[in-house]
């Protein structure tokens, strides 16, 4: 069997990918309506160089495609990028941003030149009432990481494909038998393990993926459930 070759990933890019996960959502309000800003990973066909309008923000330089439409949904006034850009206009625009967005990005202002550093991208979506804008955002890895850590983002939970399953034995206890004892066993025989992993109440421990899990069995609608927990106090049911 040949060795599995894995591509090398820059540690900073790995942090960004882990922080972004399946996507992050930020709720805000604008124009008296509830809205949502969402960042999503790029899909393979979207991996193109940064194109759009470069903006300087509180978290760093960002490049937005369809910036005019997207920024217009982040506050109470529409944004126009046509004509000569004046400082008073951007000051007014920042004052009318949603407070949540202003805390994250303000002050927002155009950058005269594109960022020359290596950038990474993600998809960005804004939904305000029945309006939606889908665009792309590019920034340096450091800036994107700062963006993801500078607000109360909520992780999007992507449902796991039911076709992907992992089978592992559930060990209830351990005991040693000689070959003669094993050969003498008959259906209906009762075995008492010398080392029990579970008690009569269904509580016990399970070793899975090199970690020790506290386990609790339960039944619901004639299905046996196994609840696992570990030191991070998260729970998983199977």
Curated annotation (Swiss-Prot):
Spell out the GO cellular component terms annotated for this protein, sorted alphabetically and separated by semicolons.
Answer: plasma membrane
Q: Where does the record place the region HrcQa-C? A: 66-238
- Localization per record: Cell inner membrane
- Main localization of the protein described in the UniProt heading: membrane
Q: How does it sit in the membrane?
A: Peripheral membrane protein
Q: Which UniProt keywords apply?
A: Cell inner membrane, Cell membrane, Membrane, Virulence
As for what it does, the entry says:
Component of the type III secretion system, which is required for effector protein delivery, parasitism, and pathogenicity. Probably participates in the formation of a C-ring-like assembly along with hrcQb.
Q: How does the record comment on the protein's domains?
A: The HrcQa-C domain interacts with the hrcQb C-terminal domain.
Q: How does it assemble?
A: Interacts with hrcQb.
Q: What is this protein called?
A: Type III secretion protein hrcQa
**Which species expresses this protein natively?**
Pseudomonas syringae pv. tomato (strain ATCC BAA-871 / DC3000)
- Phylogenetic classification of the source organism: Bacteria, Pseudomonadati, Pseudomonadota, Gammaproteobacteria, Pseudomonadales
Instruction: State the encoding gene.
Output: hrcQa
């Amino acid at each position: 069997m040949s060795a599995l070759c894995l591509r090398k990933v820059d540690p900073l890019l790995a942090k960004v990918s882990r922080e972004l996960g399946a996507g992050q959502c930020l709720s805000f309000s604008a124009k008296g309506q509830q809205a949502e800003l969402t960042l999503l990973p790029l899909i393979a066909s979207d991996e193109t160089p940064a194109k759009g309008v470069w903006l300087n923000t509180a978290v760093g330089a960002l490049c937005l495609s369809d910036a005019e439409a997207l920024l217009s949904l982040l506050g109470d006034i529409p944004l126009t990028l046509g004509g000569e850009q004046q400082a008073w206009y951007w000051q007014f625009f920042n004052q009318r941003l949603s407070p949540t967005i202003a805390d994250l990005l303000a002050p927002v202002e155009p950058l005269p030149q594109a960022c020359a550093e290596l950038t990474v991208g993600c998809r960005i979506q804004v939904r305000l009432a029945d309006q939606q804008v889908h665009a792309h955002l590019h920034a340096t890895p450091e800036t994107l990481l700062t963006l993801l850590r500078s607000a109360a983002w909520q992780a999007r939970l992507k449902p796991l494909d039911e076709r992907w399953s992992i089978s592992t034995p559930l060990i209830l206890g351990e005991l040693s038998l000689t070959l003669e004892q094993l050969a003498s066993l008959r259906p209906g025989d009762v075995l008492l393990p010398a080392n029990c992993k579970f008690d009569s109440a269904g509580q016990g421990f399970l070793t899975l993926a090199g970690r020790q899990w506290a386990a609790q069995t339960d039944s619901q609608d004639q299905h046996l459930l196994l609840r696992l927990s570990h030191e991070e106090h998260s729970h998983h049911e199977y």
